[in-house]
Each structure stands twice: as C-alpha cells, then as structure tokens.
Amino acid sequence: MAFWLPQNIQKRLLLYVLQQISLFSNIDLSNLDVSIGSKSHFSFHDVNLSLDDLNIPNVQINEGIVDELVLKLTVSGGVEIDGSGLRFIMTPLYSSGSQELHSDFLVKSIQDLTNSMLQFSDPLTTYNRYKEDDISSSDSSSDLNSNIEASKPAANGSYTLQNMRNKALNVALAKLKIALKDVTIRFIVNDRDPSDNIVEVHLESIQLITTDANLRHINIENITISSIQKQAVPDSPVHPFNNDDLSQSVYLSKMEATSLYMSAMEEQSNEDPSEPQVTQEEQENDKCKESLMEINNLNIAFKGLSSVNDLRMSNIVIDIQDVHLAIHKIVEIKNSTLKNIIDIIVTHLDANESFSCQDSQSPSPDKQEPSALSSVDIKCIYLNLGQDITVILKSFKLEQKENNSLAFSLGSFYSNSSPLTISHKTKPLLTGEQTPQSIALNMGDELDIIISHDGIAHFFKIFQFVSKCMSFYQNKSKGMMPQIASDTKRTVQLTSKAVKLSLKFPYFLLCFQVSPFIYDSNRELYIELVDVFKKLPSRCTKILTMSSITISNLQSPLQLGSYDDTLKEALIYSSVHAIIKEVIFNEEYSGIVQLVEDISAFGKLFTDSKNSECTGKSKSKRGSFLQRSVRVLNSSRFVYKQSLSANFSLKIDSMKLKVSEIIGPQFGSVEALLSNNFFAITDDSQIVYFTKNLKVERKTPSLLEPQEIMSVVLNKAVNEPVLYVHRRANGKLKVIFNNIRIHYYARWLEILKKNIGPDNASSKDEPVAQKLSKKQPTSGFPWELKCLDCSLILHPFRLKSVMVIVLDNLTTGGSSFIPQAKLLSKANTLFLIDDYQNFKIQKDKNWPSLINFYAGQGFSAIGKIDTLNFLINKSDGALLLDCKIEQVGLSLCADSFQTFCQLCIDLKYPQTFPDEEKFRTQLKNPIDVFKDIDCDLFNSAFIRENNHQNDYDSVHLVDSFLDKTHEFNNGARSKLSSQGSYEMDSSSGTATGGILLPHESYLDSAQPKEEDTPPIASKEQERDVDIRGSIDIEKVVIKLFDGYDWKYTRKFIANTVEKLDKELSKAEASSSKSNVPQSEANIFDSIYISANKNNVTDLRRNLDGEIQGVQNSFSDVSKVNLRPSKHYKALIQLNKVHVNLKNYRVDEPDESNSDNSTDVLNRCVVSVYEFEIIDNVPTSTWNKFVTLLKHEPWPHSSPMFLLDLEFIRPIDFLQAVELVMQLNVAPLRLHVDQDTLEFLIRFLGFKDKRFELIDEYPDIVFIQKFSTNSIKLRLDYKPKKVDYAGLRSGQTSELMNFFTLDGSKIILKSVVLYGLNGFDELNNKLKAIWTPDITKKQLPGVLEGLAPVRSFMAIGSGVKTLVTVLMSEYRQEGHLGRSLKKGGNVFLKTTTGDFVKLGVKLTSGTQAILENTEELFGGVGSNGRVYDASKFGSADGADSDTAAVLDLDTLFEEDQLVGSKYSRIRDHEPTAVVIDMSSPGDHNEPTIVSLYADQPLDLPTGLKEAYSSLEKHMHIAYDAVWRAKGQMKDDKRGGPSAAAVYVARAAPVAIIRPLIGATEAVSKTLQGIANQVDKTHNEQINDKYKSNRTDS
C-alpha cells in the first residue's frame, strides 16, 4: 500500500469526527497537512455535538456535550479519540411509526465513514450527496450494493471500487481507537410530569479497539444505572415554569439551554465563573439519586463490520465481571415511571416484531441463520433484596452450540444473610438447553432455603412489582400488532432434585421438604411428596405430608362441579387446577395456636396489600359469585347452573387431620377424616371449600373404642357437601354443615376443669364480657354458620342415656372478635334413648329424613321446639344471653320423663365438695355463749321489782282492731248495697259474704317484716352482674302418656307379672287351695301389684286397660300391652313462660384473705303467666284438672306461678351453698278425677335405678328460707274406688274416696320456713302445717262441697243472707223498701239457680237409673248413648248378646252421622253423647261425655235440645219395636213362644227408652234455665267437663 494511504485515511477520519462537532462543522480541511510528532493532537473543550446530524433510532437527543475531546494522530496512521465528561439528555419516543430502525442507523453510519474516506473532492459535497442517498431501506446491504452497481457503467470498475471501499473500511476501523471517560446519559421518561423519575446511565470508561483478525473489542468499566427524583423548580419571575408544556421550556432550541439542568448551569456560569450554585445543585441531585444497577466490568468482543455489503456481527462474546442489582430500590419506582418504561418497551417490541414479520414473509434460504451470540459469561450477580438481604449468583454462563441451541448454566446460588439463607453443595446448580422447540432445565443439587418474616416481606414486594409490570404490559399490548404465531410451540421442561424451604419463626423453624419433581409445560407439574417439619431446639416433628401432587396449567379453563351457598349445583371454570391424593396433618393444639399466630403475621402482608389493590377492582366483581348462570342440557329439560371463574382450584382426595392435647393429655387426640375435598380461589378473591364426607373422632388410651365427635348421618342418594365454607369478597365467612351429627360429652367438662391453668384460675373473678373482649380488635369480619338437617347428640356425665336434637334449619351469625351473635332455629325435634348402646346404625338402609332415621333406630320422639331465637351481646360489662322460643312441645311417658329430667341435670359437671371444704366444725377460738347473759334476770327480787309493770304490759288492748272489724263489716254491706248481690261461688253460685265474714287469712295477710324478706340483690350487686340470661317461651305443651317408652321397662314389668304367676302356681301346688297366699310387688316405686291365683288374668287385663284406656272383659289377655298409649292421658299447658337468670361476680378468697362476707352467687326467677292441666283419661269426663280460679281477686298482669330462687354462699371462702325460695301461686280451680289422680301419682312417682345420679360427695340442698303466699283452692273430687286394704292399714286419706266433692274451699295459708334440710323435709313441713290448718279451721268450706248437701246448704245460705240483710238494713234505715227488693233479687237468683241445679242432678240421676234398669232387662243401657259399629255390623245380630238396638242404616238416616263426627237429628245439635272416632281403643270404644257437658246457654236453646233428645230416644224405642216385628216375621220357628221372646226383648226398650228421653229433655231444659239465670256458670262447666263439640 502506498505511503499516502494511511495519511489520507487518517485525514478522512479526522474530518469525519470534526463534522460531528458543531463548532468545526464548516471548516475545510482538504489542504491540511498532518505532521507527525509528539504534539500532533487537537484538543477541544465544552464541545456541543451536532444534534441534527446525530440520529439514533427511537430516541430524541435533546443535548450532547463533551467537556474535553482530544484527537491524536499516531505515527502508524491511526486516530485516537479520547473524551471525558460526555453528557447526553435523551427522550425516548413512544411512537414507532416514523422511527428509524437500528439496522438503518448502522448502515448509514458505516456509509458516512466509508464515503468520507473514498471521496477526494470537496468533503462537504460528498457528504451531502451521500446524505441524500436513499439508504434507509429495510434490506440495506443488498439495496446499497445494487445502487452502487447501477451507477457504474462497467462491472470491473464496480468490483475494484467495492474492494477499495472494504479495504478502506477495515483500515479505518483498525486504525481507530476510541476511549471515553465519565459518560453520562439521562433519559427523561415523562417530559410532562416534573415529579417523575429520570433514569441515568453512567459509564466510567468505554474503549473501542480492533485487534488482529478483525476482532473488535468494547470494554466498559463501572456502568451505573440510577433513578433521579426531579427537584421542583421554585417559582421565579426570571424563569417561569409551565407544567402544561414542559417540552417547550426544556427543548426550545439547541443553541440556547436545552434542559433544566444545562440551562441553569450555563446561566450561572455566565454570571459567576466560580460556579458555586452549580455544585450545590449537583449535590442536591446526588441526594435524590438512587443506584439501581451497577456493572463493574463489561467486555464485548465480536467479529464483523468488515465490508460495506456485510455489516453483520458474529461470534459475540460478552464477559461481565460483577453485576449489582438493587432490587429493593427498583420495586419502589413510581408507577408513572414504570408505566412509561413499559410503554416504551412494548412500542419498540411491536416495531421490531412488525419488521421481523415483514422479513419472515419474504423469501429466505432454507438454511437457518446462526445466532450472532457466541457466549455470555457473568462471574457474579449480587441481588440486593433489602438492607440486610443479598442473594449471590455465581458463574452464569450462556453458550451457543453448533446445532443452533443455547446452553446455559448457573454455578451457585446462595445467600448468607440472616433474613435469607440459601445453600447447596454441588456445582453447577442449574443447567439447561434452549432449542427452537423446547427449553430443558435441570437442577443438579438439592437446594436449602431459610427465610424469615423480613425476607418474605421483600419477596412479596418483588412479586407485587412483577405483577404490576405484567399488568402494565398487558394493558399496553392490547391493540398492538398481533404476533404471528410459530408453527411449533416451545415447551418447557424442568427436572429438579429435592428442595428444602424453611420459614423462620421466633421459636421454631417450619421446614418444607419437596421431593424431586418434574415439570412439563405440555403436561403438568408432578411432585411425589411434600413433608413439612416443625423444628424446635429440642426436637423435630413431622406435622404435614402431601403426596402425589399434580398441578396443571391449562390453555382453556376446565369446567368443574361445585356448589353455591345454598348447596345447589354450580360450575367453576379454572385455568390452574391441582390434585392432591392425600394430606396428613398431625400436631399438638398448642403448637397449632402458636403456628396460627405466627402465620397471621405473614398473612398481614397479603391482606394489607390486597385490600389496597383490590378496593376499586373488586367493586365491579363483588357479588358476581352466583350471579351468572349457565344453561346445561340435561335429558329433556334445561338445567340452569350458576357459574364462577377461578384463578386456582384444588381437589384433595383424602385429608387426615390429627390434633393432640387440645384440652390436656387426658383428652387425647382428635382425628378427622375428610374425603372428596374441593377448594377454589375466584377472580374476585372469593374462597370456596367443601367436602362430601366428614368424620371426627377422639382417641385416648382410656377409651376402648374411638369416641365419635362428628360424622355423616344419612347415606343420601345425592352426594351433597357435608361441610361448605365460602368466604366472600367483602370478607364475610359462611360455613354450612349439612347432614352431620355433632356429639357433646359432659365428661369433657371434667377434663376441662382439671386442665384450667393457674392464670385462668386467678382471673376467675374477671367479668366474662371483659374476658371475651380482652386483647381483641374492635371490629372483625362477619361470619355466618348454618346447620341443615343436622343433629346434636347430648351425652350426660354419668348416665348412659342420650338426647338428640334434630336441627332442621339453624342459622347463627355475628362478627369475629366481638362477643355478639344471633341464632335462629325454626324446627328442632327432640329424641331420647335410655341406653346409647342400643343405638345400632343400619348403614345399608336409606332413610328419607333424620326423624325417620332416629325413630327407626330405637329413639323415642319426646318433643319439638319451634322457632328458637338466641342472642348474645355485651352491655355494661356483663354478658347478655337472650333466648326466645315460640313453642315447646313434649310427649313423655313415665320412664322417658324421668330419663329426660335426670339427663338435663346430668349435662353439667357434677361439682361436689367434701364436708371439710363446705363447713367448719371446729373453731379456732372458743366462744363463751354465757358472756352476754344476765344471770339475775330470773331472780325473785328482779321479778318482784318489775311485777307491777309486767301486769300492765301482759295484756294489750288494740282498739283499732275492733274499728277495722267494723269497717270490714260496713264494707261488706256497702258492697252488697252497691252491687245488689253477694259474690257468688264459682261453682254453686252461693254467697261468700255475710254480716260477719270470717277473714281466716287476716293474721297471715300482715306485711312481712324487713328481716323476713329474702336477701334480694342490692343495686351494688346488680352492678356486679357477670351474666344476664333470659328465656321467653310463648307456649309450652307437655303431653303425658301412659305406658312406657323403653323396652327395658316393659320387659321388666312383664317379667314381674310372669314371676307372680309362677309364684302363685308353686304356692297352689304346695298348699291347699284355700291357703294360697296373696302375692304383691312394687315396680319402679310406681306400680303396685297384688294378685292371687284367681285374678292373675284380671291383673293383666286391668294393667292393659289402665295403660291403653280399653277395658275389655271378654278378651283373653295373655300378654300385657305396655307400650305408650295412643293418646295422652294428661296435658300440661304453660303460656308465657319467662326465666330470668343472673350470675354475679364474686371473689373466691382463701381463709386468710376472707372477710367472712356473704355472697349471692346467682338468682333465677321463673314465672308462668298462665298454666293448665288438661284431663284426657278415657274414664274421666272432666276437662281441666287444674286451671285459674275465675272471679277471684288476682291481678290480670301477674303470673299464675312465680318462683324466685337465690343461691347464697354464707361464708365466702367455704363451698357450702344455701337456697332462698319465694313462691307465689294464683288461686286455682281443681277438678280431680280419681283415675287421673292415680295416673299422675303413678307417672310422677316412677323411679328407675338406672337413672339415679350418685355423686362422689352426696349433697342435700339446704333451704335457708322458704316463703309462699296464701293459695286459694276450689276443689272438685270424684272418687271411683276405695282401697280397703290401705284403709285397714291406717291410711286415713282413703276416707276421701267415700265422698264426692263439688266446690270445696281450701286455703293454703302463707308460710315462711327457715333452715330446711332438703326438699323432703320441706314437703313434710308443709304437710305438717297445712293439714292441721285445713282439718281444724276450714272444715266448713270443705264440707260445703259435699255433693248431697251442697244444694241444700246453698239454699239455706241464701235464706240466711236474705234475712240478715233485711234486719241490718232495717236497723240502719228503719224501713225495708229498697233493701227488700235487692235482697229478694239476690235470694231469687241464688235459690233459683240452686233449685234448678238440684233438678238437673235429680233428672240426670234418674236417667242413669233408667239406663241401668234397661241394661238389666237386656237393653244396652248407657251404651245406647252412642253408636258402636262392632255391635251393628254382625250378621247374627239377632242372636248375639251384644246385639245393637239400632241397625247401621237406620242410625245413619236418623242421626245423620255420614260425614260428621257428631250425631245430629234434623239440624239439631248433639244431645248428650258423642262418638270419639279417635278413641284409643282397639274396637272403636266410645268415650262417654258427661251429661253436664255442652249445656245450653239459655232457655230457648235448652228447649230445642230437649226436643231433640226426646225425639232421638223415641226413634230408638220405635226402632226397637220395628226390629222385633221384623225378626218375628223372619223367624221360621214361629209360634207364640217365639213372639213372646221377641216382645220380651223389645218391651224394656220400648217402655224405658221414652222415659230416658223424657228425663234427658227435662235435664236440658233445666240446664238452659240455670245458665240463663247465672251467665258465669256455663264458663265453669266448660272448664270442668269435656266437650263433644269440634270447636272445643
């Protein structure tokens, strides 16, 4: 090569450089000589680059300044460019439509450099010509080559020129050396927001050299990328700031200041050369500068740029020493800055994609172009996650293989910081290979990671940052040019060894050990086993195991079956679905509590951020659950199923959970088995979980078999969820139990009591409400719990019996951390069984409902609770419990009643104490009992001295007593004068007043003294109430059935009867017939059996008749039917029952700290507004056994029954508890039938030893005080039999069975008793007080009720009243005018009513005598009152002994019984009989209603019913004669004898039946007269007698 060529190239290189400097852009260097010497260089200071000529694709350069530029010309002909202080300010361009591509920029730069060296003409002309050339096509090298060849006439010349240009380019690049220092590039991301960040890239040095074989090297040292927060420019009149158009103020002109920074620097430099303010500004900017990334040494070596036609680069080798990434600062970049950066990236990617798409559509060679990248080697990467967390990645290598695949590896990945520790042993840790079809990764060593709370917090911030970036990217990429999908999708495969992840908690490590797993993007992620260990300083336990985990990331959402919060079928569409075969969990309860507390701290990281991020986003989707529906074609109809979209879904085949030491070691462990589980997280952050099988058991060595706690009840055909959990987007948690039985064991209370810690014991006096609210937040998330078709099984403490509460639909809700909840249960059925071991589940049978299930398993349905509302609240430091029940119904037999009562008592812990803890029998200091006694009090001298005074004091004359008596008598008279009548007796209408009315309760009516009142809690004690409870029951109905529910009871009674039969048989065989003894037995303290050989069969028949209500003298009873009767025998009805409970806060000091005070523990007030006992015994004609005594002075708003109980601890440090009782009962009306009374005594006296509650320390309640009011009773008693054996044995109470009482007056006087040892002593004391009082003082009132003399006594009392009133009025007024009229009215009313009532009784008695006479002569007697189908339906009715008087057709025609329950004749009301079609008898036995029932209200009605009765009985007599006539005609024997027989049969009926009708008609007429005279009498009759009307 000629010597002049390097010098020309050197000159052209110099010219090219100078052309880029605006200061020398117009200088002509064509005749410039270059000298070779030591000072052959040019130096420039503060150089501004030509921004118009310097174009970089997708970037607008706003400023380019070089502080110092040195151009050196070397001896070898090269050019060295040394620069320092390079500062550039650029703005990325967001629009890619008119921007230049990077390839165009490179081609243009090379063309400029080559043309500047080959043109020997005017360089400016050459430069301008090449500048005007079209070199901006996409295929730059081929188009440029064609343009050059077309401009040359000869091919040889073109080839020569091309070689010269390539040669010149290679020489120029080989002789060119560039070394730049202190290069700063600032990118203004958002030019419209002055507060936005500026990204600064600083290069400490950069060097470009070319070595042998055209190998180019770019060496960059200390690259720093920082984020600068702009400082707001203060307002100034010289430099106004406009936010609306920042670009105009920043980039106004290239000759003036082109940035906020440079304009300030230049203006300040012109004013002051020393530039003190610039330094201050730079320092302030440095304070706001955050370093994001640092690269210590970056070396890039490549081949290429050797020809103008071939500008490709190949064999690119990148070598990086250290990379420092400040991740914790990157994640804090402002959202606006981050969004702008992503917008730029997405825009440029879209432009490059568009170019690549165009290029791919053009013809390309079959051979794929190899990648220009050869290898990348990064020695070390430092990831700074926080101030104390640094993750180090070493030896990251990437290498291009011959088969166009890319291999990469990571040597190590570790961290030794306290919040995060990562370690492994084998190197390299990760290797992989990328091909156009797949990416294969292989982790060659086990990875051990330990992370703390701070580490998770930093990782979560990174996760949020990445999610935010992806969200911005997805939003920006919408609407961009769609990418052309490749034919083959690249798959990702990962093979990993075991990974160990440990979470660091304050007291333990939670380690997750993941077995080697495989991931295939085309298939799924499969993990064989995941174990979770809990590492304590002393031990390590496995708490969780998950096996066979499969996670699938689906391209299209998978449709899964689910349920909504009403347990209706729904659909869930999920893109990520996981399946776990089995989950096993085992941990202690205390460890779970600690783990939950520690994990909750981690959970705050997620909840706080999610609440802030999803506030606006969830508004549109909130409530979207189950609002959409999908129509699914099912058979021949459409089924609409609600749908939901989920981010993640999980199916777990089996879950085994074991929690040990929940209460203490004695409790054992609780194990749960849940199968067929489903879990999903929806798009709007809702959580759905359900399981279709659930079983929870308690296991402990003390139990032979596992103790069931919770399980599925019925095997339904439709497999519905049994447990459903739904957390809504607003945070409300809803839990549903379906078809589940839950067990409660009272034995748990004993374990709980023994395991109460000292801390809880010391805080026993702390209010319950304060305990609930202690250390709890003021608000929480709402929750709701539902139980559908569930059952609650209650196991008592000592008994084997069990009560089941079937919950049809129970709903409860409240808010977490707040002691407030509401409960609503609509229908609850009660079941009872005597021994739970008799409960045998039939698993193979399908039951339609829970009620049928328990009824078929040996349980007895004893009642139902309708509409229960329960409320828990807190007020004034006390816990409020409010329960409201609409109705409670109980149906009980004697044995089930005892079981029910004893079970309710035994549901609590039987807390008893020995006598040493209840009493102090030995005193520490002796007491002198004679200390305060005056020994001279009874001396003769003292008595004589006070004798005179004592004589006067011995008798007190109370004058006011006589005055009060006089006032009382005057009051009685005034009452008579004002009302015109005396107060009538409720049953007989007799007067209760007179001139001198004995006030027997006068002394008892005095107000009790202050010391006699019960110790009612004071206001101060009311403030110390810990728990307030109230129970309001609108109605309680208790039905008492005869018979027995339990098989054990029935079998025992039957065996006892058989045993008596055998004993009598043996006694008869061993002795003579006359000496057979009487056998007796007492069963359950309720049934007394006495029989001999002759009446064993009668005994069975009587027992069967008493229980079932059927007396059949002709049937042979070989076995007693002891099952519950078909209908109840008695009904107890309570209305408006209210129970008020108060539990007071008391201290429990020991003896040393005691002040010997008395504590009121709790108080219970039970009130019943109205109660009645209904008599439904078949042999009884009476209606109400107990009811309110009408027309007695009793406040309408006061309850009929009030019981006030207070439990008092006399000495605070002793455990003895005493009871204070106060009883108030309203006046009562009693209608006592002997059969009903015996049934109630037998029912309530039943005692089964199996249900006796035996305590460790038997305790009898000590009644400190008992008080009751005066109770007025009005008694009707109907005896039916007399127990002569009991009378002979001395039971004087049997004498009552000789007399019938009607309206006897009894007053149980007010009693106050102290110091009673139990209720048995209370009963004896009350008998000892009330019985003598009645027999000595109230015999007139009792004898007044004797039935034979009652009417005569009432008439006599009326005559006495008339005479007495007349005499009194005559003495006062002197004449008898007005008083005679009033007294006569009273006498007439009283005597008329009593005369009529007496006539009614006489006619009714006459009717009974006539019916008995008819029956004696072969008639039906009293059975003729009703129709018996069994008698009229026999074919041989004429010859039968039980032949009916009327045939069926006739009775139907006459009485119109078809379609009606009661008999009616010609639209008349029924007479005096009724056919009870629901009779408990097996042979349609009728229930005979008393002739006194359903009396006519007045005389017209009485006459109407009298006519109906007479007509009816006349029809019966006529039918009997007509029937006899027909039988005589049908009799084949004929003859006078046969006719006489038929006439003899019909004669009694034909003669007596009209008499019966006449007596009944007279009775009805008299009843109408009596009720018309006394309007209140009919109300009393309705209370007393059963009615045959449907509306009764």
UniProtKB/Swiss-Prot annotation:
Keyword Manganese attributed: no
Gene Ontology BP term (one): autophagosome assembly
Keywords in alphabetical order: Autophagy, Endoplasmic reticulum, Lipid transport, Membrane, Phosphoprotein, Protein transport, Transport
UniProt xrefs under InterPro entries: ATG2
Membrane as UniProt keyword: yes
Bilayer disposition of the protein: Peripheral membrane protein
Modified-residue entries (Phosphoserine), positions: S236
Catalyzed reaction equations: a 1,2-diacyl-sn-glycero-3-phosphocholine(in) = a 1,2-diacyl-sn-glycero-3-phosphocholine(out); a 1,2-diacyl-sn-glycero-3-phospho-L-serine(in) = a 1,2-diacyl-sn-glycero-3-phospho-L-serine(out); a 1,2-diacyl-sn-glycero-3-phosphoethanolamine(in) = a 1,2-diacyl-sn-glycero-3-phosphoethanolamine(out)
Region Disordered: start-end pairs: 264-286
An example Gene Ontology CC term for this record: phagophore assembly site membrane
Pfam families per UniProt: ATG2_CAD
Subcellular location: Preautophagosomal structure membrane; Endoplasmic reticulum membrane
Main location: membrane
Single Gene Ontology MF annotation: protein-membrane adaptor activity
Similarity field: Belongs to the ATG2 family.
UniProt-listed PANTHER family: AUTOPHAGY-RELATED 2, ISOFORM A
Function description: Lipid transfer protein required for autophagosome completion and peroxisome degradation. Tethers the edge of the isolation membrane (IM) to the endoplasmic reticulum (ER) and mediates direct lipid transfer from ER to IM for IM expansion. ATG2 binds to the ER exit site (ERES), which is the membrane source for autophagosome formation, using basic residues in its N-terminal region (NR) and to the expanding edge of the IM through its C-terminal region. The latter binding is assisted by an ATG18-PtdIns3P interaction.
Protein name as annotated: Autophagy-related protein 2
Gene, per the UniProt record: ATG2
